[in-house]
């Protein structure tokens, strides 16, 4: 009998998180969109989208009428009746071309519809070019003397500058959104095989980032271009979208489709045509796996960059080089690739023949510069550079390497796209200056648009998960709170119910190892014991890291203790929650950490953050992110961060923010000192630790004795072998 239930049988509690509630691990969400609210549904069902549209039609054609309300899709662009098609039919042409022409002509939305849909989904597209470049240059006509005199007077007068608000309004764009993935084939004419692969993956309703970015990258006719450029020019694009919103799919579809077209137009020109840069090996491997699913049967080869791989032919090398066959490049990263590398181990490694190269910055820079011993080689065929998690790649840690790769791509039609859930203004300015510098270096005369697409509120956490900020006072309090998550007692309305699988983030590698050893035996043997908990960090070998990732995805590992190595980009669709055992170094890191749950619109994810007395000066930025996320959620539930707490938490200076971002909380960096007692992750007594330290000292002393040469008998053995040489003088 449960005593708590007996004593509280007449008490009414608020509905808590029951075990039968919706969890991310229960499967795919019905609608992956985050910002489709009831107001948008009313707009889509109103007469603004159900009434007739005025269209320019051929003579003799009647006005097109929309279908029933049931035929309307999510975005108000319903099926058109047969009367809307042109009367003159081209019977000889393929039906696919007819569909494409019909969709381009009849299904185009007016600006009011585009504006309404983009605003309801919180999508904002902005032209990032200088304001002078946005003004269309019109051809000068012959002017009379009076007009010339008047124009001269106007030029002499001081130009009326627009206010910031007017400039922002002038920069706003409203491109036509993607209604469904079927439009990729009918309207944007992507590869047939690529469209089939997308359908086989089960993608039907595009997310906000796909809704806005795919039309831009595939050639949206509704985006105004500067005069002198083609109407459907692919832009340079900066995308800021929530975690788990499908950014990988958004940049892989246009890249693969562009390469398929290139193969048809220039079959003789083969080589690396696109480079995708990611900050970690885990994220790069994931991009390759997702890309190969989309590129299946298209002839596009996607390769994961590995150590020792050659990507270019250098002029200062021997001419006798082997080139990997296309079939070999598809199996890179497998056992066949290792055998192929072993065959060429006597000579030099073969040049990789691939269309899309996915890499981390340092690996590719070393390959292009022969491990920093030679000048950086160029990649003349690359036409697309994709920076996934661009804010990290352009941080001081990776900035020089990333910019070196960017500058080594010398094709005049190179397009760059930067993707992340958090992107500061400094990253935008750096990208803008790099594009301008590259244009001046290559003496390009053609101008390309530079657009920024923002989904939701910039640098905010996803609104479909619950956030919990828990004060634990001390390190032992955090450990106790974490054990209560693993072994929950009688449930109440205020309890945090977090079911495996979930991630635990720590600040440093030693703390991750210590926490793993502390929790190793907390799961009973009947449930799998210590095999259900693992630790993952950068000091492990590549084989160990990939094996742990594989077991975690299979469900063999339930709890994974890690550092910020897995904070970005890695897609675990069934993660039920995230535990920040140590507070993140910045608000951006918090956004990425908690974004490992709630992927693709899944509801029920929980993000728990523990903080101690030493963390209080650094918590306010995280509390602000949680507060904004709960406002975006728009529910009447009790807030996890109260207003009094936001007012009480101290503000952090800019200098301290930079120090925190670089080094983390200082209290947790003091290992082996007196202050280490406060931050130690352990429940062992002092006596047990002393015994362990004595044992370690004895083992190390024994090893040192074995490694030192013997002094006694060995030193006298040489004299014995020489024999007696008489008395010394």
Swiss-Prot record:
The keyword rRNA processing applies. Residues 87-101, 686-695 have a biased composition (Basic and acidic residues). Pfam families: DEAD, Helicase_C. A motif (DEAD box) lies at residues 388-391. Residues 228-441 form the Helicase ATP-binding domain. One of its GO terms (biological process) is maturation of SSU-rRNA. Residues 481-649 form the Helicase C-terminal domain. This is ATP-dependent RNA helicase rok1.
């Amino acid at each position: 009998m449960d005593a708590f239930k007996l004593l509280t049988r007449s008490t009414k509690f608020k509905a808590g998180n029951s075990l039968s509630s919706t969890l991310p691990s229960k499967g795919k969400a019905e609608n992956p969109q985050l910002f489709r609210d009831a107001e948008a549904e009313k707009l889509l069902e109103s007469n603004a989208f159900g009434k007739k549209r005025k269209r320019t039609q051929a003579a003799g054609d009647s006005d097109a009428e929309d279908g029933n309300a049931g035929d309307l899709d999510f975005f108000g662009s319903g099926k058109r009746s047969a009367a809307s098609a042109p009367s003159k039919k081209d019977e000889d042409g393929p039906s696919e071309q007819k569909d494409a022409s019909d969709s381009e002509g009849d299904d185009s939305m007016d600006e009011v519809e585009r504006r309404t849909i983009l605003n309801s989904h919180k999508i904002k597209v902005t032209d990032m070019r200088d304001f002078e470049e946005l003004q269309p240059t019109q051809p000068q006509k012959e002017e009379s003397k009076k007009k010339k005199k008047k124009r001269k007077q106007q030029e002499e007068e001081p130009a009326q500058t627009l206010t910031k608000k007017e400039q922002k309004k002038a920069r706003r764009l409203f491109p036509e959104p993607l209604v469904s993935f079927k439009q990729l084939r009918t309207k944007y004419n992507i590869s047939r095989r690529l469209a089939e692969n997308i359908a086989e993956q089960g993608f039907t309703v595009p997310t906000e980032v796909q809704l806005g970015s795919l039309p831009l990258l595939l050639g949206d006719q509704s985006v105004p271009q500067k005069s002198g450029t083609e109407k459907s020019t692919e832009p340079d694009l900066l995308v800021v979208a929530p975690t788990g919103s499908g950014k990988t799919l958004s940049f892989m579809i246009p890249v693969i489709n562009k390469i398929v077209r290139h193969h048809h137009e220039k079959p003789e020109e083969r080589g690396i045509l696109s480079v995708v840069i990611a900050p970690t090996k885990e994220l790069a491997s994931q991009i390759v796996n997702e890309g190969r699913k989309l590129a299946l049967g298209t002839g596009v080869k996607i390769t994961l960059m590995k150590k020792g791989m050659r990507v270019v032919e250098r002029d200062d090398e021997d001419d006798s080089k082997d080139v990997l066959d296309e079939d070999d490049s598809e199996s890179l990263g497998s056992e066949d690739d290792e055998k192929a590398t072993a065959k060429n181990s006597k000579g030099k490694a073969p040049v990789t023949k691939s269309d899309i190269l996915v890499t981390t910055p340092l690996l590719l820079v070393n390959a292009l510069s022969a491990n920093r011993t030679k000048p950086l080689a160029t990649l003349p065929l690359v036409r697309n550079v994709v920076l996934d998690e661009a804010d990290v790649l352009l941080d001081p840690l990776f900035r020089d390497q990333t910019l070196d790769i960017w500058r080594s791509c010398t094709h005049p039609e190179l397009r760059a796209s930067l993707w992340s859930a958090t992107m500061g203004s400094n990253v935008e300015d750096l990208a803008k200056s790099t594009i301008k510098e590259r244009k001046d270096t290559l003496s390009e005369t053609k101008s390309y648009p530079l657009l920024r697409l923002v989904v939701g509120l910039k640098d905010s956490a996803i609104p479909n998960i619950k956030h919990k900020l828990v004060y634990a006072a001390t390190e032992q309090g955090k450990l106790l709170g974490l054990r209560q998550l693993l072994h929950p007692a009688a449930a109440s309305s205020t309890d945090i119910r977090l079911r495996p699988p979930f991630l635990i983030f720590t600040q440093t590698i030693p703390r991750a190892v210590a926490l793993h050893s502390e929790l190793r035996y907390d799961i009973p043997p009947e449930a799998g014991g210590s095999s259900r908990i693992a630790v993952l960090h950068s000091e492990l070998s590549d084989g160990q890291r990939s094996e742990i990732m594989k077991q975690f995805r299979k469900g063999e590992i339930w709890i994974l203790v890690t550092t910020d190595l897995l904070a970005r980009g890695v897609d675990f669709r069934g993660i039920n929650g995230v535990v920040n055992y140590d507070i993140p170094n910045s608000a951006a890191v918090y956004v990425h950490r908690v974004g490992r749950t709630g992927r693709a619109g899944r509801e029920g994810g929980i993000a728990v953050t523990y903080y101690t007395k030493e963390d209080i000066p650094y918590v306010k930025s995280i509390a602000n992110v949680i507060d904004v996320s709960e406002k975006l959620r728009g529910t009447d539930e009790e807030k996890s961060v109260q207003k009094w707490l936001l007012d009480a938490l101290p503000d952090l200076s800019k200098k301290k923010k930079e120090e925190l971002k670089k080094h983390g909380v200082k209290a947790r960096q003091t290992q082996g000192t007196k202050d280490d007692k406060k931050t130690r992750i352990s429940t062992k007594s002092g006596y047990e630790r002393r015994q362990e330290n004595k044992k370690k000292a004895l083992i190390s002393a024994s090893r040192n004795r074995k490694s030192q040469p013997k002094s006694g008998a060995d030193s006298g053995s040489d004299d014995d072998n020489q024999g007696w040489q008489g008395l010394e003088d």
